[in-house]
């Protein structure tokens, strides 16, 4: 285990050094992965489940006769999940449901001028696919974060897939969240099967969920193909930035930094503070807590991507944070809501000492599927709207049309769109003949 001891004074750096200190771990543009994924997608499109079965043997080291998990197995999964975990999942489900139900938008119905009615309505996506990767432990929390809003949105078919064997906790969470079908399949081949369908696996309209480099590349490729599905986002390594002052609890900050660094060796954590005393306390606490963590070596590797930045004041912390545009932002200061007013770019924000990032990961109610790699500048956390589509409606009365007709003719003529102008003129002439 390496000793973490990285404090950098922001104002001792030149502009290039300041830029470099905020660089994220490089995501390699791997042409080998691109080519392999392209071949997998092509084989699934042509050979369907035959190719899917061969890839499952190759990558998952198991033979699957039937990819779909039976309803009986989904229901019986409850028997293999202990009650304390069921209770915790129930609490998380309740909070996530409450927060996402509050996101239901009302339709818009207005008259922009007399006789011109404009509406905006929201319709659920028909079929969505949820990908849950395998790992050291089952990621049932991601099932909740994706299946619950899909159900609230009214998606008619919710499909989940995960590499075999699928843990009972995943099956249990999927069942209580209203997932319709579950398939034992993983990797780029699973994304391709969801994207284009097979004999027994339905094609979906949009694919959600995280995964490794192959899954991410597959999502990118299928979404770029004509008639391919939409995707939620391309997830990068997880990241956390903390703004703290002398009033902050150093042990809390250290624990939060370590919890985020735990995600993967590519994770990045940053502390911004004007207090050198706090920075030193945090370093001591990080190294003390790290000794007691089972993944200390991996966390230490992630800390190589990480830094504590000493600033002249909190205003400078805000400026740096807005430049970095973190996935997760913790504001642990004396008056966090004053800082909040100045934050422009962050995917999910945690205020005060009692709001660890772990709360958002699991059970506060907000979604943990978030833009990374600075994308919070222009992108948002996953929400109910991602499972719906906006539809626009307009209805003009004859008088409303006449009132607007001259405007339409002038504008279409200015853009040299003769057929547009004619579509207006032919109606005007028709109405004049009736008078």
Swiss-Prot record:
Residues reported in the UniProt entry to bind Zn(2+): 260, 263, 361, 420
Keyword rRNA-binding included in the entry's annotation: no
Active-site annotation: 327-328
Any one biological process term the GO annotation gives: L-histidine biosynthetic process
Entry keywords, A to Z: Amino-acid biosynthesis, Histidine biosynthesis, Metal-binding, NAD, Oxidoreductase, Zinc
E.C. no: 1.1.1.23
Needed co-factor(s): Zn(2+)
Catalytic reactions of this protein: L-histidinol + 2 NAD(+) + H2O = L-histidine + 2 NADH + 3 H(+)
Binding site for substrate: 238, 260, 263, 328, 361, 415, 420
GO cellular component, one term: cytosol
GO molecular function annotations of the record: histidinol dehydrogenase activity; NAD binding; zinc ion binding
Matches recorded under HAMAP family: HisD
Family statement drawn from the similarity comment of this UniProt entry: Belongs to the histidinol dehydrogenase family.
PANTHER family for the chain: HISTIDINE BIOSYNTHESIS TRIFUNCTIONAL PROTEIN, HISTIDINOL DEHYDROGENASE HDH
General function of this protein: Catalyzes the sequential NAD-dependent oxidations of L-histidinol to L-histidinaldehyde and then to L-histidine.
UniProt protein name: Histidinol dehydrogenase
Gene name of this polypeptide: hisD
């Amino acid at each position: 285990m390496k000793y973490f001891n990285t404090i950098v004074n922001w104002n001792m750096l030149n502009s290039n050094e300041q830029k470099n200190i905020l660089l994220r771990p490089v995501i390699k543009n791997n042409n080998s992965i691109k080519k392999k994924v392209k071949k997998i997608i092509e084989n699934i499109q042509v050979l369907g489940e035959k190719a899917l079965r061969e890839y499952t043997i190759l990558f998952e080291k198991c033979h699957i006769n039937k990819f779909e998990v039976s309803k009986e197995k989904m229901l019986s999964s409850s028997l293999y999940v202990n009650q304390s975990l069921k209770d915790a999942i129930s609490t998380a489900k309740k909070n996530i449901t409450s927060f996402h139900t509050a996101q239901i938008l009302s339709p818009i119905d207005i008259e922009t001028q007399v006789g011109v009615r404009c509406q905006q309505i929201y319709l659920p996506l028909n079929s969505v696919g949820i990908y849950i990767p395998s790992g050291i432990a089952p990621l049932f929390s991601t099932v909740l974060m994706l299946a619950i809003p899909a159900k609230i949105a009214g998606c008619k078919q919710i499909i989940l897939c995960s590499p075999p064997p699928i843990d009972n906790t995943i099956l249990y969470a999927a069942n209580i969240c209203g997932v319709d079908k579950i398939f034992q399949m993983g990797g780029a081949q699973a994304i391709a099967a969801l994207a284009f369908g097979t004999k027994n696996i339905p094609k979906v309209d949009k694919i959600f969920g995280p995964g490794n480099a192959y899954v991410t590349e597959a999502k990118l490729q299928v979404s770029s193909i004509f008639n391919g599905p939409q995707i939620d986002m391309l997830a990068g390594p997880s990241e956390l930035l903390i703004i703290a002052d002398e009033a902050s609890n150093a042990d809390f900050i250290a624990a939060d930094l370590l919890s985020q660094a735990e995600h993967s060796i590519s994770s990045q954590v940053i502390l911004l503070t004007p207090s050198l005393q706090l920075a030193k306390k945090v370093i001591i606490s990080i190294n003390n807590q790290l000794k007691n963590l089972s993944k200390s070596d991996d966390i230490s590797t992630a800390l190589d991507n990480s830094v504590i930045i000493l600033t002249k004041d909190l205003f400078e912390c805000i400026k740096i944070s807005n430049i970095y545009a973190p996935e997760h932002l913790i504001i642990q200061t004396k008056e966090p809501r004053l800082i909040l007013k100045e934050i422009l770019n962050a995917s999910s924000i945690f205020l005060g000492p009692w709001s660890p990032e772990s709360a958002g990961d699991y059970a506060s109610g907000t979604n943990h599927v978030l833009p990374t790699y600075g994308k919070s500048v222009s992108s948002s956390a996953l929400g109910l709207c991602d499972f719906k589509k906006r539809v626009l409606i307009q209805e003009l009365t004859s008088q409303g049309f006449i009132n607007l007709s001259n405007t339409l003719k002038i504008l279409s003529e200015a853009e040299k769109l003769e057929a547009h102008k004619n579509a207006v003129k032919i109606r005007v002439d028709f109405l004049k003949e009736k008078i």
